[in-house]
Design a protein with these regions (language model features):
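Conserved P-loop NTPase "ATPase switch" module shared by AAA+ and STAND
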Residues: 154-177
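Conserved NTP-binding/hydrolysis module of P-loop NTPases
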Residues: 111, 116-138
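Conserved catalytic segments around the Walker B and adjacent sensor/switch elements
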Residues: 99-117
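C-terminal alpha-helical "lid" subdomain
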Residues: 1-24, 109, 240-330
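The catalytic "switch" region of P-loop NTPases
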Residues: 170-174, 183-266
């Protein structure tokens, strides 16, 4: 009986380690966890993300001492898993470090990040902001206007410098509650309640286009565009530098004893195809592949692990429909 061909091609075979996971020893579990934390929570310096952080720090500086006056906001739209949320987390960490460097006490409320939900109405949005501000009465049965005024009071009392609303694409839906939240975001800026940064995926672009009055208050859009190594030498260098930094981090943190050769031309080409040039997606793919490589006792992340991660994660996430780490079936 003929063997059925794999439509994605012939997968590479493991070079080191086992094909499947080994018994979970303490050492294996510790290294797999370290790999996950490094790749999901760690920061790799990347020029386009640095530019966004610098722009938002400038925005913070421009708005200090201006509460109660009309404020502009900022917005960032880019594909899912492109690195937006990690950039916002790094912004928060760097502003906290700047505060300490100035001799000021730490302020956990300096930057407040709220993730919007597709079901969130205006009152729910306000309550989520107040919950992040540790308001004991965030869920009190009061009007949205009262909640809005409480937010203004808490922002001043807690010295909030930025409010970041993530996943704003959920406001794109055609519903009264979504429109109400959108209208009040404009009021947030007009009243100078708090400096506001709106972050969303590619679906947020039509939302901003359809809400011109809000978009006009948000200045020039911040861009975290995908790299184009095939068409730009500078982008090729940035992409290789980022992948190399991930490889170095895996060795420096003693997760693997050997290089994963992420900067070889063949691997770079495959990573580019999987990620479409979004470095955040490269890190996300590695966050799936690296722990799996640890668990099977491999000396590094191999094409076998990257192929499995592509098939089991990236294709399912809708990033692509092929596996560039596999060899096309004859």
């Amino acid at each position: 009986m003929a063997t059925k061909k794999d439509p994605l091609g012939v997968q590479p075979k493991p070079i080191t380690g086992s094909r499947t996971s080994l018994p979970r020893t303490h050492e294996i579990k510790a290294r797999a966890l370290a790999a996950t934390r490094l790749l999901e929570d760690g920061w790799v310096e990347h020029d386009p993300q640095r530019a966004i952080i610098d722009d938002l720090i400038d925005y913070r500086d421009q708005t200090i001492g201006r509460l109660g006056n009309p404020l502009s906001g900022r917005r960032l739209s880019q594909f899912s898993q492109a690195g937006k949320s990690k950039t916002m987390a790094q912004l928060k960490a760097e502003l906290a470090a700047l505060r300490v460097a100035l001799g000021l006490p730490p302020n956990p409320y300096q930057v407040v990040i709220v993730e919007l939900d597709r079901r969130l109405n205006l009152k729910g949005f306000y309550q989520e902001v107040l919950r992040k501000l540790d308001d004991d009465f965030w869920d009190a049965d009061v009007s949205a206007k009262v909640l809005e005024n409480r937010i203004a009071d808490f922002v001043r009392k807690l010295d909030v410098e930025l409010l970041i609303a993530d996943e704003v694409q959920h406001l794109r839906r055609k519903a009264n509650d979504a429109n109400e939240v959108t209208d009040r975001l404009k009021v947030f800026l007009d009243r100078g309640i708090v400096p506001l940064v709106l972050v969303g995926d590619e679906d947020s672009v039509p939302f901003f286009r359809a809400n011109g009055k809000l978009a006009a208050r948000l200045g020039n859009p911040l861009e975290l565009a995908p790299l184009n190594p095939k068409g730009s030498v500078a982008d090729a260098k940035l992409f290789k530098k980022f992948c190399g930094a991930l490889d170095e981090g895996l060795m420096k943190n003693r997760i693997f004893p050997s290089s994963s050769m992420l900067t070889s031309n063949k691997t770079l080409d495959a990573l580019l195809e999987v990620s479409s040039g979004h470095v955040g997606r490269v890190a996300r793919l590695l966050s799936v592949a690296a722990p799996a490589a640890v668990r099977r006792g491999a000396a590094c992340v191999e094409p076998y692990d990257l192929s499995r991660a592509t098939r089991e994660f990236a294709i399912g996430a809708g990033w692509l429909v092929t596996d560039p780490f596999s060899i096309a079936a004859p």
